Amino acid sequence: MKRLQAFKFQLRPGGQQECEMRRFAGACCFVFNRALARQNENHEAGNKYIPYGKMASWLVEWKNATETQWLKDSPSQPLQQSLKDLERAYKNFFRKRAAFPRFKKRGQNDAFRYPQGVKLDQENSRIFLPKLGWMRYRNSRQVTGVVKNVTVSQSCGKWYISIQTESEVSTPVHPSASMIGLDAGVAKLATLSDGTVFGPVNSFQKNQKTLARLQRQLSRRVKFSNNWQKQKRKIQRLHSRIA
């Protein structure tokens, strides 16, 4: 059977590459929001949903328009993928799997995706991304399978890359016929039916004082200033470690 697997690593971009990634993520956010706005206008006029094929022609139109020619500086594939994300959001809404698509806010969950054109050099811990060039990453494990797509995202002030691969694996056959029960709790992380007990990690308690100190420092900063943003990223990184 075929198995899809994701490998996530922290990127180590240069200063210019980081600026470009922010710009690409902003362009994808712009395309998604502008297409959603046009879909809303179309719906208010009493017309049916416009599929991806037509939305792709909007992207060509926007690239040629004087006020949005800056979209040409971003790679085409991630911009197209943002339109496919919007199409997927509408399909999930029509099938009652999700709420109606909402506008994205720049700076929150920044991400963009490459379906192809990526080169992976695991031996030297680097990856090639169109219009970004070669970039190093923290190589913590071997990537196996055929690369299907690559997603670049930002979290807690750092950039990450998620490589999705496809590989052929044999169907697993469990040799045992016995079963075991598991009870998850708060005081005890897990208790097995054979009496084995796993204690809690208590990562929050270990970092509670540090978190309180950082939050006090944040309250003294001028909201939305550079120092406030830096302090907020420190808190986000600590929350990431706790999780």
For the regions a protein language model found, what residue spans apply to each?
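Nucleic-acid substrate recognition interfaces
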Residues: 1-243
